[in-house]
Amino acid sequence: MELVFIRHGFSEWNAKNLFTGWRDVNLTERGVEEAKAAGKKLLDKGYEFDIAFTSVLTRAIKTCNIVLEESHQLWIPQVKNWRLNERHYGALQGLDKKATAEQYGDEQVHIWRRSYDISPPDLDPQDPNSAHNDRRYANIPSDVVPNAENLKLTLERALPFWEDQIAPAMLSGKRVLVVAHGNSLRALAKHIIGISDAEIMDFEIPTGQPLVLKLDDKLNYVEHYYL
């Protein structure tokens, strides 16, 4: 069976080189075109889906809608869940990546961005931009809402959604599309493929490119490739 991952199209803060994380930003025109191209590619290759999973962030939701519209499948059920959100970049969210490197040093910022288990500084829960003050997360216990994450923590909060929602859907015979974010998809790919802690640091998923993961009937990994 096949599982298709798509990272959201190029966003406004991708263009501005800002740390985004859980901040809710829109797609650029380039991002819209990437999503359209992904949908057309899926249509041309004959990919049909029974259900789509995405995050609760606008850039992923819009990408999902565009992909499904272009592939003539906008009618299928979509499940939105915060566990597919991007990695939370803590107090770095909204900061310019280059300026942050100049302030803290390239090595420190590289550790924050690429270390598997070291998180950036926490975002104050009282900050106006904190998820604690966003009503889309109102039903999540406050001690579960992250203030900063590394990739390890991103996997730990995404994995229950894989086990409770995505995997059962696939095992029941449903054809699944997941439209999410660079780090939430990397985390799930790490689990599915069996990528080591060291190797995952160099595993990148470009925006708007359908990534196909071939699995056997027990969801064991076989191979992966881009369309």
From Swiss-Prot:
Q: What keywords is this UniProt entry annotated with?
A: Gluconeogenesis, Glycolysis, Isomerase
Which pathway features in its UniProt record?
Carbohydrate degradation; glycolysis; pyruvate from D-glyceraldehyde 3-phosphate: step 3/5
Subunit (UniProt): Homodimer.
Species per Swiss-Prot/TrEMBL record: Haemophilus influenzae (strain PittEE)
Tell me the protein family, please. Belongs to the phosphoglycerate mutase family. BPG-dependent PGAM subfamily.
Locate the residues binding substrate: 7-14, 20-21, 59, 86-89, 97, 113-114, 182-183
Has UniProt tagged this entry with the keyword Isomerase? yes
Which Gene Ontology terms describe the biological processes this protein takes part in? gluconeogenesis; glycolytic process
Task: Describe the function of this protein.
Answer: Catalyzes the interconversion of 2-phosphoglycerate and 3-phosphoglycerate.
Record-linked InterPro entries: His_Pase_superF_clade-1, His_PPase_superfam, Phosphogly_mut1
Identify the HAMAP family for this entry: PGAM_GpmA
Q: Site described as Transition state stabilizer, positions? A: H181
Q: Which GO terms describe its molecular function?
A: phosphoglycerate mutase activity
Under which name does UniProt file this protein?
Answer: 2,3-bisphosphoglycerate-dependent phosphoglycerate mutase
Q: Where is the active site?
A: H8, E86
User: Is the keyword Transmembrane helix in the record?
Assistant: no
Catalytic reaction list: (2R)-2-phosphoglycerate = (2R)-3-phosphoglycerate
| Taxonomic placement | Bacteria, Pseudomonadati, Pseudomonadota, Gammaproteobacteria, Pasteurellales
